[in-house]
């Protein structure tokens, strides 16, 4: 049994939750194809690293960054699906 899955993509959007406790990071390979996108839920438990594996902040992420996101196997059935981000690696 795998503990998590991963998705490779480009950051298309970064937004805050209503209460400000979470950030939503939408990734995909085609901004016009909503069916290829995933919405990652960032929390204080999410680890973010740069290409040299140095820990960085969520504020160091930008639209257009290419990333590998390791995320929970549990996803909503919405479009795009949402899942908890465990590790985000900037390429």
Where are these predicted regions, by residue range?
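Beta-strand/loop nucleic-acid-binding surfaces
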Residues: 35-56
């Amino acid at each position: 049994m795998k503990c998590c899955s991963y998705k490779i993509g480009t950051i298309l959007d970064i937004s805050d939750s209503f209460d400000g406790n979470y950030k939503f990071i939408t990734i995909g390979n085609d901004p016009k194809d909503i069916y290829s996108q995933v919405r990652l839920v960032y929390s204080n438990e999410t680890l973010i690293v740069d290409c040299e594996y140095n820990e960085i902040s969520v504020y160091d992420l930008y639209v257009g960054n290419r990333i590998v996101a390791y995320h929970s196997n549990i996803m909503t059935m919405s479009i795009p699906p949402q899942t908890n981000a465990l590790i985000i690696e900037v390429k």
